Amino acid sequence: MSARPKDQQALSRPVKRSPSAHRADPKGHVSEKWPRFSASNDAPLKKESIGSIPKVGPTFGSDALEAAEAARRRMDDPAYRVERDRRRGRGAVSNPTGRYEPAQREGFDDGWDIEEELPPLPTEVIIEKPRTIITKNDSPDILFEKSINPYRGCEHGCSYCFARPTHAYQGLSSGLDFETKIFAKPNAAELLEKELRASNYQPTTIALGANTDPYQPVERKFRITRSILEVLNRANHPVGIVTKSALVTRDIDLLSQMADKHLVKVAISITTLDPKLARKMEPRAATPAKRLETVRKLSEAGIPVSVLVAPIIPAINDHEIEAILKASQLAGAQEAGYVLLRLPHDLKDLMRDWLVEHYPDKLKHVFSLLQEARGGKDYDPAWSTRQSGVGPYAWMIGRRFETAAERLGLNKRNLSLRKDLFKAPAKETGQLSLF
């Protein structure tokens, strides 16, 4: 009998999984005195929304304490924790079974030890051929109606990414699978042209990369994002881009052309100025210094650029708000927005695992503040508050951000894009030219 690698261990017996209990709170835990902020570049920061400091909300209870201890027990279990050598250069520290899978996988020691170390997990690119490429959005707190995701998953490996749970739709984990199994859509530009030619199509700003970073490392090879921009430029179609990659500067030639026609704006996500923290949170994204340099290059090229301080993680990077905004303003950013940490579905457990690995002494404090801002829960998906939270801590974060943004002139919200220039792409006839 030949020895099997540890990453190919047999499955244990199926373990039944309970259905998800994530439901929106019908009351929303909203007070008219609490601030509401949006990370969107189109949403104004309303000074009048800041009222008196809200009363203290729910505190860190017994359920939360048990969740913290459960995370510690999980990370002490070698059948759950992925070995450090295997996840070198990755953000997630675990790879739990997808929430829609009927059975839960658990590793076990079969006695076939191997002496050599297993190599780090490679990135696998899976080609996907979707039938459509524009996704419609009807969430009232998201100020774009359409989006395009050139990829599924993201190699940047940001530990906090709210899009991680979407990998469950592919039967995969929101942990390491999300950053090692990337789905690429090479026919995206072709589909986009077809959809823009539809007789009933109405142009509105398309968000490029709502659930993935359009300039993640695999874009260097596949160039799907650039092909999409080429179509949008020819059609004079407005687009908004969110990225934390310096690769966006590769397309300055296209973006400059679109900026001249008021068709593009770019938001650079900057979560910290500390390179050590960045390596832990977002190991394959550009360094903070590189992102600030990207802001400078885009601004000097005449491309409207804003900065997103997103997410703000209690007790981890919340002390950097003012410093990030100041550095961004000096680099040439024109606007700024923020989002409080969001932990939908199994992301809450992934975040606890990450904290146990990197900041075990802060685990309880992080979730104490987060639950205070989420009505006593790890996450509240209520549309009116999911971006900014509620309660005293959320109020304080909003007030600090607004004050700094106003002082630095980053609260103008003046990057409106044109849609009146749109012209549908010409339909190819399939006939050869005579000349």
Regions of interest found by a model, annotated:
Residues 1-146, 416:
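Flexible, acidic/Gly-rich N-terminal and inter-domain linker regions that tether
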Residues 17, 34, 428-435:
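Peripheral terminal appendages
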Residues 213-215, 311-315, 387-388:
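Short histidine/acidic/glycine/proline-rich micro-motifs that form metal-
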Residues 222, 256-270, 317-334, 395-399:
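Short, electropositive alpha-helical surface patch
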Residues 258-260, 284-285, 324-326, 353-357:
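Short, hinge-like loop/turn segments at secondary-structure boundaries
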Residues 289-349, 365, 372-373, 403-407:
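Conserved C-terminal portion of the radical SAM core fold
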Residues 349, 355-433:
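C-terminal accessory regions of radical SAM enzymes
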